[in-house]
Each structure stands twice: as C-alpha cells, then as structure tokens.
C-alpha cells in the first residue's frame, strides 16, 4: 500500500510538471503533447458535461421526489431538535466560550507583560555583556540580518510569480469547473434552497482584468549593539522602571477586571445550576404524581361502582331455601345476593370509601411536602457549594494580590509614585469590599422555581377538586341510599299490613264456620268486639320464617323486625 501511494504521488507530480512545462513554454515533443492533451482535465469537459446532463435528468425523475420527502421529514423531525440544541448552545456554551476567550486574552496580556519584564531585566543586560565580551557575535548578527533580507527578497519574488500564474491556472480549470458547478446548482435547486450561480464569463475572465494588491512586509534588522549599549546603564534603568510601572498598572487592571467578571457571573452561575436542578426534579416527579392522581381516580370509580351496586341491591326479593330452610335474597334480575343490604352495611361501604380516598390524598400531600423539603435542602447544598468555591477563590485572589502589592511597595522605591500606590491600595480595599458584598448577595439570593412551583400548584389544585367532587358525589349516593331504604321499608310495611289483614280475614272465617257448625250464630256478634284483640294475641302462631337468618324466630315476622330496626337506627 505504501508503494502504491508513493507511485501515485510520483505520477501526479510528473503529470503536473508536464502540464506546467507545456503551458508555460508551449513547444514540446509530439509524444509529450499527446500525453499532455489526454491528461488535461479540459479535454474531458464535453463528455463530463453530457454525462452530468443525463445524470441530472435521472436525478429529477427518480431521486428528487425521495429527496423532497427526506427534506420534509428533516424539517419536521430533525430541525426542531437542532433548534433546541442551538438554543441550548447559545445559552450555555457560547457565554462560557466568550468568558474563556476573555480570560485567555487577559492571561496572555499578563504573560506577555511578564515576558517583557523578564526580557528587560535579564535578557537585555545579559545580551549587552555577551556582546561586550564576544565581538564575533555582532558579526554573526550582521550575517543573519543579511541572510534574512535575502530570504525575504526571494520569498517576495516567488509569491509574485505564483500570483501571476494563478489567473492562468484558474482560466484553464474553468472549463472543467463550469459543468460540475452547473450540475451541482441543478441538484441544489431541487432541494428547494437558494443557489448563487456563477456564469462562464465570470469564471473565464481575462487575467488582465483582475487586479491584485500585494502587501510586502519588510523587516530590517539592525545589529544588536544599536539596540543595547552597555555603557547606557542609566537609560536602561529608566526603561525598566517605566516598563515596571506599566506592568503594575496592567496587572492591577487585569485583576480588577477578573474580580468584576467573577462578581457578575457568580450569581448567574448559581441561578443556572438551580435552573438545571429544577428541570431535573420536574422531569423526575411529574410521572410519579401523575400516576398517583390516576390511582386516586381509579379508586374513586371503584368505590362509586360498589356503592351504586349496593344501592341497586337494596330493593331485593326474599325467598326461603327449601334445602337449607334459610332465607335467601335475589336482586331485580333474579341473581342471588351474597348478603342482605342493610343500613349498617351501607354505612360501612361509605366509611371505607372515605377512609381510603382520604389516605391516598394524605399520601400525595405528604409526597408533595417531601419534594418541597428535598428541593429546598438541595438548593441549600448548591448555595453552600457556590459560597465555598467563591470564598476560596476570593481568599486566594485577595491574599495573592495583597502580597503582590506589598512586593511592589518594597521594590518600587520611587517617592513620586507613593500617591499612585496609595490610590492602588484604596482601589484594592474597594474591590475587597465588593467581593464580600457579592458573597453576602449569594448567601441571600432568592431562588425561583417557576416551572416546578406551577406543577406542584396544579397537583394541589387537582387534589382539592377531586376531594370536593368525591365528597359531593358520596353525599348524593348517601341520599340515594336513604331514599332506597325508605322505599324498601315502606313496601315492607304495606306487605306486612296486607298479610295482617289476610290473617284476620282467615281467622274471622274460621270462627264463623265453627260457630255456625255448633248452632251459636248469635255469639258471633257478641265476640266481634274482642275479635281484633284475639287476632293480635294469636298472630304469633301464624308467623312465617324470619326475614333475616340471624334474627330470632320468636321475635315476630321479618317485616316487623325490619320495621322496628329501621325505626331504631339512624339514616345512612
């Protein structure tokens, strides 16, 4: 593979050199002219143009519809996510990049000032001493300067030659570039995007109509002895002192800018981290509370269905099981009931519904309180972390800069600069107070959970609405159950009255028959006055099996027991 790569590179270089030679000088042997002709890209321009035209037609008939569908899918499915990513990048990444760029610029300035200071303090005096001890270095510097000038001269000549040959190369490449560019434009237009076309006249413009502006940078090196004179110690010290003052001013300005940027960004960083935490909490708790609301709704419907079925089973029919001689009950559709619906049983159903719904509601509210406490606790942790980081940063910055200013006071012995040093210390104290103030602001900075707070309020509002609706509907069902019980008790009393009248009629007929058989018809009128009392005294001997299997047989008829029970118990 390596040999093939070398062969390919060698072939390309040979062909390129051949094309350059034939285009530059024109006269070349016939065999070389043939090779140059068939290796020149413009030779194949007509064929390429014809093939690209056919390919464009095939593309418009076969590929363009699918490309349009893919483009629509791209716009509908992918672009919204790309927009979100772009917004997130613009909000979070770009500010950090700008901040990093600004910090890098400040760091570079400080480093450059330090390098300049080191160069003026150490390199320049050392160079002067070396030049004084070794005169040959001066001659070497002169030779290096002349070599550099020669190199710059030939580099400028080479650049000029390349610029002169470049228009001819562009003109030769225009023949092959034009069909490729036209086919690309047609494909690009099929995608529904704007295209800026380039005409052949523009592509094959005459070299003479193009103007080039060449800027040449010339560096003139003088010998180092002209820059540094060993005997000029006073002038050098003045330059060093001036540079030192500039360096101090630049460092103080950079430190002040760093303090101000940190003070402005610390609250923003805290707010952004809290916002990200809020988003994570909302995504974590939202499915949980939605599931709890669905659960309480499902439980409410279960209790409603159970109570409604019990209300429908209140009006039931009583029969006696011939096999077990026990009372059984049937609903309106003839289905046997598992148990007889009484007022205590109905009250138990209502109590179960109220208790379970209240427990679920209390559980949801406890979860809400737990979420609020957890969020507040985590916010305190985040705040404390930011405060600790800021305090550490502020302590390092303030202590290091105070040492730096103290060092400047020791090194700088200029009495005229005393006023400037006092102003710097005042500015330092002002910035230190600013740092402390920002720390207090970070400690008391309010936190707003707009999205999470809105969601929790919606959950609480939904709970209140569900509790109100459950209470109202259970009250309606309780009233409906009372009406059903009253209707059943009324029917039981009417049925008991009819049965009592039937028994009285039967007893009268029996007594009349017995007296008539004995020839004592006159006595009937005599006993008519005490007949009702006699029937009441003998009514117990005509009782039917009890309505409730749990009731005592000798306590009267089931209808009488139900009526007495209803009279003694409160409503549902």
UniProtKB/Swiss-Prot annotation:
Report the locations given in the UniProt record: Mitochondrion
Going by the UniProt record, its keywords in alphabetical order are: Coiled coil, Mitochondrion, Ribonucleoprotein, Signal, Sporulation
Q: Which residues form the signal peptide?
A: 1-19
Q: Please provide the Gene Ontology terms (biological process) for this protein.
A: sporulation resulting in formation of a cellular spore
Locations of Low complexity compositional bias?
560-572
Q: Name one GO cellular component term.
A: mitochondrion
Look up the domain of life of the source: Eukaryota
The residue stretches assigned to a coiled coil in this entry are: 351-372, 485-510
Span list, region Disordered? 539-572
Q: What does this protein do?
A: Involved in spore wall assembly. May be a component of the mitochondrial RNase MRP (MtMRP), a ribonucleoprotein endoribonuclease involved in the cleaving RNA transcripts to generate primers for DNA replication in mitochondria.
Q: Give the record's subunit note.
A: Component of the mitochondria-localized RNase mitochondrial RNA-processing (RNase MRP) composed of one single RNA encoded by the NME1 gene and at least 31 proteins. Absent in the nucleus-localized RNase MRP (NuMRP).
Family of this protein: Belongs to the SHE10 family.
Q: What is this protein called?
A: Outer spore wall assembly protein SHE10
Q: Which organism is it from?
A: Eremothecium gossypii (strain ATCC 10895 / CBS 109.51 / FGSC 9923 / NRRL Y-1056)
